[in-house]
A protein has these predicted regions:
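Intrinsically disordered, low-complexity terminal regions
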Residues: 1-219
Length: 219
């Protein structure tokens, strides 16, 4: 799947989704926008034509797994989603960025080739491969662990001043900095640390290869 995902706060209690398709060679009409409701919410996908050699058909399903092989199809589908306050958001693309602005609930954002930017009053989790991650979270009471991972890009988190967490942060070509006082466990280095912020407890995992990691305190 190719295209950006842009989520922003709705003014009312209705979810509004706009999908914009464009291409140079392939037929945009061949890419279907599917809506799949479930007990947990609604899943909206761009479903590309299934390639002849695909092992399974392209389809839109709920949950973390669905098949979406595009082969040489160059259709790009950009989604704009207006999300009401209190509604959790899960955004997933492959070739594109994910931008989430001023939402009022928890956020999960995933891409492969693209950056991730999140701003929410809840907590968040994000993964990419080629791109940076920037996240501002209004809550720091996630139940178990949250993780932010990339390979080529930095990670910058803005977190509440009352944060308590067990932090594991690693980078290869970069540095790790924190505005929060840290009680370090084991060896501390500029590229790796395991430490406690506040009372500890819940886990915060941060990992990159080429990029720096920054924990910033919000007021």
């Amino acid at each position: 799947m190719s295209g950006d995902v842009h989520a922003l706060a709705a003014t009312g209690d209705q979810i509004d989704v706009t999908a914009t398709k464009h291409a140079e060679r392939s037929d945009p009409e061949a890419v279907e926008i599917k809506v799949v409701p479930s007990d947990e919410g609604v899943t909206i996908c761009a479903v590309y034509p299934t390639p002849r050699r695909a092992r399974e058909p392209n389809e839109c399903t709920t949950g973390d797994h669905w098949s979406s092989s595009t082969e040489d199809n160059d259709v790009v589908v950009d989604f704009e989603v207006r999300v009401p306050a209190g509604v959790k958001f899960y955004g997933h693309t492959v070739n594109g960025k994910v931008e989430v602005e001023h939402l009022g609930a928890d956020v999960w954002a995933y891409t492969v080739n693209g950056s991730v930017r999140v701003s929410t009053s809840g907590y968040a989790e994000a993964t990419t491969v080629n791109g940076s991650i920037t996240a501002q979270m209004g809550r720091a009471d996630w139940p178990d662990a949250v993780e932010f991972t990339t390979v080529n890009g930095g990670i910058t988190l803005d977190l509440p001043a009352n944060l308590s967490a067990e932090v594991r942060a690693t980078t290869v070509n970069g540095e790790v900095t924190s505005d929060f006082p840290l009680l370090v466990t084991g060896r501390f280095g500029p590229r790796r640390f395991h430490g406690t912020i506040g009372q500890g407890g819940r886990e915060l995992k941060l990992s990159t290869v080429n990029g720096s990691i920054r924990l910033r305190k919000t007021t």
